[in-house]
């Protein structure tokens, strides 16, 4: 899914809302997010330029239950680059290694920094 679409990523942080009610269960839940290069870092234009808006992918999220934030992105999060999606690009496609499915390993801490961009709701249908 190419969400949230194309926008000026150097000025705005595109935001979308997802209804995950059917996925939340009583007890402990796990939230996994797969980030791709998308419009932010993919090859663009006839020159094949990359990283037009930056080199590092990032996520800002908040999970709410009954209108109350129960999980917010922060420095306690962990990340890994060892999943089955090895490479992805809007023009060059995706390299997927099915041998790595379910083998997420190499978790490490994440770098946090304050958001300085204007959070902008995207004009796309929530998924």
Map each language-model feature to its residues.
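Accessory beta-strand-rich segments of carbohydrate-active enzymes
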Residues: 1-102, 107
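Edge strands and adjacent loops of beta-rich recognition modules
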Residues: 107, 111-127
């Amino acid at each position: 899914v190419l969400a949230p679409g194309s926008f000026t990523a150097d000025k705005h942080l595109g935001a979308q809302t997802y209804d995950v009610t059917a996925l939340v269960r009583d007890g402990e839940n796990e939230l996994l997010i797969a980030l791709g290069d998308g419009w932010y870092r993919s090859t663009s234009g006839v020159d094949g330029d990359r990283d037009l808006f930056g080199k590092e992918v990032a996520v800002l999220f908040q999970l709410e239950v009954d209108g109350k934030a129960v999980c917010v992105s922060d420095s306690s999060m962990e990340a890994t680059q060892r999943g089955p999606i090895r490479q992805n690009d809007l023009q060059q496609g995706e390299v997927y290694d099915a041998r790595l499915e379910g083998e997420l390993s190499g978790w490490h801490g994440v770098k946090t920094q304050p958001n300085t961009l204007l959070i902008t709701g995207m004009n796309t249908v929530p998924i």
